[in-house]
Amino acid sequence: MPVSTRSKVMKQERNEQENTNLNLPLRNPHQGLKEKMRALTLLYEQQKRASFSLRNPNHNQSPKPEDQRFKTQLLDSSKKGDRFHRLDGKDSTFVEEDTKENNVFEADRIFGVSSVPVKPSGVIRKLSMGNGARNVSEAEKLESLNASVSRILVFVRLRPMGKKERENGSRCCVKVLNKRDVYLTEFTNENDYLRLKRLRVRHFTFDSSFPETTTQQEVYSTTTGDLVEAVLEGRNGSVFCYGATGAGKTYTMLGTMENPGVMVLAIKDLFAKVRQRSLDGNHVVHLSYLEVYNETVRDLLSPGRPLILREDKQGIVAAGLTQYRAYSTDEVMALLQRGNQNRTTEPTRCNETSSRSHAILQVIVEYKTRDASMNIISRVGKLSLIDLAGSERALATDQRTLRSLEGANINRSLLALSSCINALVEGKKHIPYRNSKLTQLLKDSLGGSCNTVMIANISPSSQSFGETQNTLHWADRAKEIRVKECEVNEEVVQVGEEEGADQAKLLLELQKENSELRVQLAKQQQKLLTLQAENIAAANNNNNISLTPPSISSLMTPPSALTAQQKKKPRHSLLSGTCFTPESLKRTKAEEAVKELQLTVKALKMEMERMKREHGLQMKKQKDELMKDLCSRKSEKTPERCKETRRIVTRGSLRPKEKEKELKSPSHRFASPVAAAKKRSFWDITVANTSPALDRRKTRSHGLVHQEAPSKLLQPGFARPHMKH
C-alpha cells in the first residue's frame, strides 16, 4: 500500500474515534462533591434530631413536608452497569436535575481523557441511617455515657437594679421566667441601621435561675446544700461565681453580717452536720484561704512571700500554704474576716469595693473510724469556694495605671478559663490549664473527679448588655462540660499483727477497767438507795411517835449548818412540824443522793485520770528501755581497737613539760607562767597574721618598743595572778 493511502486511512480512523468521543456524554466533575455535601447535611440533621430527642424526650417532633429529602437513605449499588446512583426517596426535582446532568455528562469519562470508573462513595453508607435503628443504638450509648459521666451544674443569679443605674436612665434588659429560662433583650436605636435586622431577644435555659428577689438562703440551699453532704461522705466539691465586675459575685459568696453568703452558710451547715455525725467517728476540719493577684498566689491567713504551685498525684498543691484546724464556726468566721481584710480590694469605675483578685477558700474534712477488724478507715472530702474577680473593659482614655494592669491580669486569667471551657466542651485531648495560675487551681474542679457548681451573676442594666451577654454565653457553654463521676476518697489502713495485738490487749484492759468501775458505781448507788430508805423509815417512825420533828431535823440538816441563835433557842412549838412535809423530805433526800453521786463520779474521773497517767509513764519507760537497748547494741558493734586508740585530753596533758633542775616556789601553782613563755591568745594570732600588720608602712611609732602588759584573761590551767599594790 502506498504511503499516501496509508496516511489517509489513519486520518480517517482518527476522525471517526474523535467523533465517537464527541458523541459520548461527559462526566460532571462536581458530582462527587455534591454527593458528599448531601451526606454531610443528612448527618447534621440526624445528629440534631437525636440531641433534641435526648434533651426533650416528651416532645414529639414531626418532620416538615419540605424536609422529606433529609430522610434516611441507603445507596442502591447492586447494579454495576448503572452510570449514576439514585437515592431512594428523592424529590422529582432532584431526580430531574440529576438526569439532565447525567444526560449531558457521562459519569465514567471526561472529554478527551480516559478515566477509571468512579466508585460510589463509602461515606454515604457510613453516614446514612436506615429506619432509625442506629438512632436507638446511639441514644443508648449516650445514655450509658451520661450515667457514668456527670456535668457541671450552672445557675444564674440576677441582681437588682442600682440607684445610679436608674438615675442614668438605664432599662432592664433581663427577664427570668419559670426559675429556669432567661430572656435577654437588646435595646437598639432606630437610627442604627446596621443592627436593625439583628435578633433582639435571646433565650437561655439553665439548671435554675434566680430573680432579683431571691434570698441568700434560697441560693445556698439550691446550689451548695447537696455539696456539703457529699463532702462529708468523702467526695470533692467546688462552687465558683463567674461574671462581670459589679454583678454581685462577692455578695453571693461572702454576703454581709445581716445576709451571709454561700461561704458562711456552707461553713455553718458543715459544722452542724459534723456535730451530728461525730458520735460514730472522729472528724477533723482544716481551713486554708488564698488569692491569685496579678498571677501570683498569696496566703490570706498568713501574708508573706508568694506561694509556688506544685503538682503531684493528689493534684495541684500550693507549697507553703498554711492550714488551720478549726473547731467551731466562730473560729472560721474570725479567720474569714482576717483573710478578707488582707484581700486586695480597690475602688473602680464600676464598683467602690471591687475585688482585684480571685479568692479561694478550701475546707478539708477528714473522717476516721475503725471497722470490725480494727482497720482504720479514712475519708477525706474537699470543698472549694471560689470568688472570681470580675472582667472589665479598659477605656481608651485610661492611662497605664495599677488598676489597668490589675484589670489586664484579671482578663487574662478569665480568658484562660474560657479557653479551658472551650477545650473541655469540644473534647480536646490537651486542655491549657497552665496558661494561668487560676486555671491550674481550678483543674480539679473543671476536669477532675469533682462535683462542680457554677453561679453566673448578671446585671439587669441595659448599659452592661455586652457583659451580660458574654456571661450568659459562657454559662451556656459550661453546661456542656462533662466531668468524671465523683468517687469517695476512702483509704483503709490495715494495722499490723503486732500492733493489732498490742492495741487489742490495751483495748481489753481498758474495757475490763471500765466494767470494774461500772460495778463499783452500781454498788455505791445501791448503798445510797439503802441509806435513803433507812432514813425515810426512821423519819416515818418518829412522826408516828410524836408530832415534834427534832429527830427528822437532826437527820436532814447537819449540825454544822445550824446557827448559834438556833442552838441557844431551840423551837418546841407544834407548828414547827409543818416545816417538814413528806414532799420536802423526798426533795432533800434526792438532793443528797445527787450530791453523793456527783462525788462518786468525780472520784471515778480522778481514778481514770490517774490510770491514764500511769499508762503514759509506763509507755515512756518502755520507750526509754527500748532506746537503751538500741544504744547498747550499737556500742557492742563498734570494734574494740577503737577503744584502745582513744586518748583522753585533759588540762594536764596540755601543760608544758617541766624542765629538769627547775626550782618550784610555793606559789608556783597560783602564779601565771613567765612572760617569755606566755601563751598567745586567738586574737593575738589573728592580728599578727593579717596582711595589713605585715605589709603596712612603718612609722616612728613602730620603732618604739612597747612593753606588753600582762594579759588579764584567765589562762587555761592557771589561776588569776595576785595583783601587786
UniProtKB/Swiss-Prot annotation:
SMART domains: KISc (SM00129)
PROSITE patterns per the UniProt record, alphabetical: KINESIN_MOTOR_1 (PS00411), KINESIN_MOTOR_2 (PS50067)
Keywords, comma-separated and alphabetical: ATP-binding, Coiled coil, Microtubule, Motor protein, Nucleotide-binding
A GO biological process held by the record: microtubule-based movement
Protein name, per record: Kinesin-like protein KIN-8A
Biased composition (Basic and acidic residues): 655-665
One annotated Gene Ontology cellular component of this protein: microtubule
Highest classification ranks of the organism: Eukaryota, Viridiplantae, Streptophyta, Embryophyta, Tracheophyta
Covalent S-S links between cysteines: none
Sections of the chain in a coiled coil: 499-541, 583-617
InterPro entries to which the protein is assigned, alphabetical: Kinesin-like_fam, Kinesin_motor_CS, Kinesin_motor_dom, Kinesin_motor_dom_sf, P-loop_NTPase
Family under the similarity heading: Belongs to the TRAFAC class myosin-kinesin ATPase superfamily. Kinesin family. KIN-8 subfamily.
Classification via PANTHER family: CENTROMERE PROTEIN E (PTHR47968), KINESIN-LIKE PROTEIN KIF19 ISOFORM X1 (PTHR47968:SF13)
Span list, region Disordered: 1-32, 652-672, 691-725
Gene Ontology MF, one: ATP binding
Residues given in the record as ATP binding sites: G243, A244, T245, G246, A247, G248, K249, T250
Limits of the Kinesin motor domain: 151-481
Any single Pfam family the record assigns to this protein: Kinesin
